[in-house]
Amino acid sequence: FVGDVFGAPLAAEGVLAFFLESTFLGILLFGRHRVSSRVRVAAAFIVAFGATFSGFWIVVANSWMQTPAGYEIQGDKAVLTDFLAAVFNPSTMPRYVHTIAASLAAAAFLMTGISAWYVRKGRSLDVAARGVRLGLIVAVVASGLMFLTGDFSAKQVAETQPEKFAAMQ
């Protein structure tokens, strides 16, 4: 019924983000003795960008299911009428920023934990101590952003889906 609309963000994720990630992940993993360290660092950043971009399209698809926009019913199926309205529906950006903040917080806590383990074992103390400090700073900032965007998302749900908001309470 909604394949023409719902398929668009999934196709964008597959074509744009997934291939970007997989190509540069291959360079990152298998290019150690084949490409320079600068190329490998660039590949790592491109993989991170690709994963973030992939997450955007996945959130777009989920957000469209929650607050559909940019389509109309024609006969027995939904037809995409405004791609940008479907992509940037009322819940896309709050959900996406919340997801990115949560991902950063999780990664920062992981980095902090691994760095703290190195400090405890007395290995690579210089790098490990910087890892603990940076990890904690990013974790605190990302967690604060996560709380703010979570509140904003809840207000958006209350506005666009009052029944769902009532069930959340």
Regions found by a protein language model. Name each.
Residues 1-169:
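Polytopic transmembrane helical bundles with strong interfacial aromatic enrichment
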